[in-house]
Every structure is written in C-alpha cells, then in structure tokens.
C-alpha cells in the first residue's frame, strides 16, 4: 500500500511536482540563455544584464544544483569545471576561464558600516533561548589577510530584539565571523554557549539582501525558519 507506483494517486502527485520543478528550471534556463545573448551583443545596459544574468544562474543552481561538490566553486562557461572554494579570489586564477578571480565574484557585499535587518518567525523557534523576532547585524570591521585572501574576517554587533515577560527586550552581542567568496556566504560564529551561529547566503549580483538561517555549530542543522537579512541604506 505504501508503494508509489505508476498509475497510483501518490505517483501522480510526485510526477506533478517533478514536472512543475522541471518547468521552472526550463523557464529560468531560457531566460539565462536570452540574457547570455544580450551579454554577447553588448550595449549600454551591459552591467544590468550581467547582474541579472548572475542572479538567474544562481536561481537555476538552487533548483538543480551546479554539478560541484559542497565547498567548491563552479567556474561556469561551456565546460564543467569545479575548484575548491579556498582557491577563489586568492589573486591567482585557477579556473580555465579565470572566473574565480572575476571582479563580480571577488567584490565584497558586507562592507564595514553595513547594517542588515532580519525579521524572524518565532512560532517555529524551538532552540534559541530568547525567541528573537528581529536581528540587526551591524558590520563594524572587514579585513582581508594577505596569506588567506579567499576569506574575509568580519566583526560586528548583533542586536537581538525579543519579547520577555510581556515586554520588548533588546540585547547586543559582539560577534565575529567570515565571508566566503566562493559560496557568497557570510558566516557569523556562535557568540554564546548555546553554540548557535548564523549563515547568510548572498546571491551573486544582489548585495542588498541575503537568505539567512540560525544553525547548530556541530551539525549545521537549521534552527527554526529561514529568514531574510535586508541591507538598510540609512541607519543613522
């Protein structure tokens, strides 16, 4: 009875979801190809097309993967090539097409002075002690080591807003972490003894927001729902 067999109700549901996913990938792939043609043609809107092209490529990779193992960078181009993310933006091209040293890959989204604001759903938070409803992450320092250029050392302050005993509360924690050029990830290391950190995934071509989640340090298992950090332009 538990078999998902052709012709059965469960099979129809699975097949429908698979068809829907394939259709989404095909639509995105079509848009990527159209933008690639615009990039080849050049024109006044080249930078706009390039940014949108990278955004769409990222979305396709999210749906079907990019063919690389975890902690690897997809070089792109006509031939499949993957390199360790430790080799990205280290000052020496390792991809055959030099993509790992491209300025779009190696630019820095979380510059010093950046404020990222995220709103969290407390209903599914079963592991934090405060059950925060808002994170305000202020990046105070970004440093790049000459001997380890593929990572940026990041320091900042995390303002945690939550409700306790019927009142709005705020705590501020000093935090540190790193930015990984190869994966476009900002990682905030656990600031407290609960060993919960934050991982935030930027999309190539979009520095204004990143998809974030609280994670257990040991397992990287997500704690509660994902949320979105949005860059605040004016936080004076």
Curated annotation (Swiss-Prot):
Which keywords, in A-to-Z order, does the entry hold? Disulfide bond, Oxygen transport, Transport
**What function is annotated for this protein?**
Acts as a linker for the assembly of heme-containing chains in the construction of giant hemoglobin.
Disulfides per UniProt:
68-82, 75-95, 89-106
Question: What InterPro entries does UniProt report for this protein, alphabetically?
Answer: Eryth_link_C, Eryth_link_C_sf, LDL_receptor-like_sf, LDLR_class-A_CS, LDrepeatLR_classA_rpt
Q: What is this protein called?
A: Giant extracellular hemoglobin linker 2 chain
CDD domains, from UniProt? Answer: hemoglobin_linker_C (cd11673), LDLa (cd00112)
Fetch the Pfam families from UniProt: Eryth_link_C, Ldl_recept_a
Q: Which domain of life is it from?
A: Eukaryota
MF terms from GO for this chain are: oxygen carrier activity
Question: PROSITE patterns per the record?
Answer: LDLRA_1 (PS01209), LDLRA_2 (PS50068)
**Known partners and oligomeric status:** Disulfide-linked dimer of identical chains. A model is proposed for the subunit structure of the Tylorrhynchus hemoglobin, consisting of 216 polypeptides chains, 192 heme-containing chains, and 24 linker chains.
Q: Which SMART domains match?
A: LDLa
